[in-house]
């Protein structure tokens, strides 16, 4: 072969190979601008210094959605179990369970309702704690699964209260073509959503059933493709039907078949008898009791219903109501008058009054829901708006919809509720309203096209420090130096949770160093310490915000901490060395990235304060684009979607109607949304607020971010006070709030076991325990730490702090925890 032919080709081939390698590398990561970058190819497994393997595990499935538009699907929301639907991870189906009750998803908590798509239809129940129901858990006699006492281990030798609600499956919504008896539904798909409402469909070979549900909505609106409305309800042999028009009648076993209901609307009183409720004050005494739940069904205008197919199922009596025509209907759970509970038999007069009001709103279909915050000085107002449209062929009331308000929405707020005569009254008259029981406290009935809540924005500072004298300033300079010298590099290199916490500790030293510089006897030494903190924080966080190692030519492996963008879910995923399923289930992103944002803010603050300092590396300008992506991951304020990646869902963690965040990404399991640490959620929203207010480098998005961050910060603080700490200044309401409502029932809960707070709230349970241990210090600490300049809400009321009985923990346990010991308490 002629060598002259090869001579020019060889350099060309080498150049092509280099270009090809460069293109392949560039395709593995993307920079949003500046020095930061993120991976778009999953990082390979890597090794830690101790030779342990670190891997990134991506979500097993993508969104279960069939919806128009460009939006990314929310996670960490009340309806997420419908979107995060993994066929390999569905509820257990015990041997002998009827096919009708096989779940097509996990339970979904809209509150006051809970529902679950099943093969036999949409199973529905009131999400209600029954604190009298007897039961066992772990061989421990309880006052019921409604109030469980869990022995939490030898280390604490204590009892951990555990409050939860039940899914009794009182109604099954379906159609004449696919209902309870056919057990034919095979799939469920999300078809649309707004800020706190969702649309989904259930399909069988013969039917498509479309459902509209909302957080705080007592209604479920159903539209059918082909069949007529059909509802199966349980009556436990002693139920009663109350039509809107006509006489009521019993539905005892075998008596209901063929019974006509000559009204489009009727209610069912579901009386469930129980026996031998355990009385903590006297274990020898037992007491029979019943619970009463009232459900309402609304057929098309001019329709009637016929009861058919009465049958027994697992001790229950089931009756099926078939509608005379139409392809739409609605179901609802009715409230009780204030002062009555699920243990009190409801009056027919109240039921008919409620039926009339609910019937006039049942077919005002909610087509959109929106929350809009406005910041004014030190307060923020959030407006909640419903958009409704009449279902075809119906003429609902024109004043909007009915909704159930949580305590944070009506307590000490200028909103209206419906009183006992169905007129509007101020929420300060809550004892004259209608309510549903809930774990968080009574939910009040209200109507309209929306409402507004106003909250004071708590103090939010970069750090908390007094004005030190020279001696104190000098000591603090030495402590800053000591913190730098003793920092464990292995701990600093941990994953996206503990590593982020350690970087955050560095960042918290920056404002402290700035504050003490002027008082120190040697300002140069203080300045040197501050610069050392700045450099280490900037270098460490900068490394975390790059997808490549320092050479910039290859993609990091999972042990080197690259952030990977998952276009299916629209999220930045960290490697899961210590991430508590932040990768595979998208848990806790607001915790992890909140620490990153706070660190970035303090680095930027130092640079803004020292623009001409020769040590100013321009970190903020270089990494602000990546910081903004992390902010959008946890708190994107755009609903419409850009249609181009990277894009993110609207408010990933913060649930506007609930008033706080949910930390669980998938909400899998039958507990629904879950959040343990309110303090870390609050820290995240405070970090966003400080970043927006600092506005360095200046960016137009920060003005919008500021009002949303202030709203989430203020609302999360309010929810933490009410629901996790059970605290309100309204002494009259206090016995009804959160876990305190159980303390008010001496025949249901032994008062010594009622805690001063709860450490974890799920949508169907709240517990005074943590996922990582149960000494009281840990159970309290998860609601306190990190203590920062945004933690001042914890000390707003000294009386409340004293009541939490934390003084002993601070004096005896805190030093031991700081020394790495496990406190005996």
Residue ranges of each PLM-predicted region?
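Ser/Thr/Asn(+Pro)-rich, low-complexity disordered segments
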Residues: 27-588, 637-660, 695, 708-825
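Active-site neighborhood of glycoside hydrolase catalytic domains
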Residues: 678-715
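Bacterial N-terminal signal peptides
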Residues: 11-21
